[in-house]
A protein has these predicted regions:
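Extended soluble regions of mature proteins
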Residues: 19-230
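N-terminal signal peptide c-region/cleavage motif recognized by signal peptidases
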Residues: 14-16
């Protein structure tokens, strides 16, 4: 199957931007309302913690965390309701990244530049990306104010069906004359699907205490799936 730009915002592997230390807060919503609230925190050493707050089918709150240390071979997915920590190797992410290498060269897109707009107090460039092969429309509101890889670094440990690495995304954007940037807002609409909107509420540079990136005590710790063997 040909890998495409179905979610240009992807979040697989990126080089840590060590200069950024602080927090990003965002929401994920659809026509039915806000589906999840996201809070990502970044250390100046390159550690990332992402917390997602949502509700289950019964309306009960659900809180999940992904911890991605800047050193070591593993990252951690934490289910606070079950009090479980799943330890997974970074090598699984590297394997997925190899599968998308080169996909930005073959992207069959139409690009529309729709002017400027202010999103959460930040001036942005509104770009519409139309994936002709998959009938997907992606609206991006881009800024140069923040590192472009903050989304990728926060989400790379979660399986969201997002397909391009930062390098491939940038390659595809540049091919069509668009300067890559940080997405303050993203709207993704696939043919026959429900539009989904990622909206950044706040990005703030601020010191983050080391204990934010520590694993919680008293949780059961289990091994997750290993990387497939070549």
């Amino acid at each position: 199957m040909r890998l495409t730009l179905s979610c240009l915002v992807v979040m697989l592997v990126a080089s840590p931007a060590l200069a950024f230390e602080g927090v990003m807060e965002a929401s994920l919503s659809s026509e039915q309302g806000v589906a999840a609230r996201v809070r990502a925190r970044y250390s100046k050493q390159g550690d990332v913690r992402m917390d997602i707050h949502s509700v289950d089918e019964d309306g009960e709150p659900v809180r999940a965390t992904t911890l991605m240390p800047s050193t070591g071979e593993n990252y951690f997915s934490i289910d606070h309701g079950q009090r479980v920590i799943v330890e997974m190797p970074y090598s699984t992410l590297a394997t997925t990244s190899k599968q998308v290498t080169g996909s930005g060269d073959n992207a069959n897109l139409a690009i529309k530049k729709l002017g400027k707009a202010t999103v959460s107090g930040v001036e942005t460039r509104h770009i519409r990306v139309i994936d002709k092969d998959n009938r997907t429309v992606i609206d991006l509101w881009l800024t140069q104010k923040y590192p472009a890889d903050l989304w990728t670094r926060a989400f790379r440990g979660r399986n969201l069906g997002l397909e391009l690495s930062d390098d491939e995304r940038s390659k595809a954007m540049k091919k069509y004359g668009v300067k890559p940037g940080f997405s303050m807002k993203m709207r993704v609409e696939q043919a026959g699907g429900v539009p989904v909107v990622f909206l950044v509420k706040k990005v703030q540079r601020a010191p983050v205490p080391p204990e934010v990136f520590a694993l919680p005590e008293g949780y059961q710790r289990i091994d997750g799936p290993s990387a497939p063997q070549p």
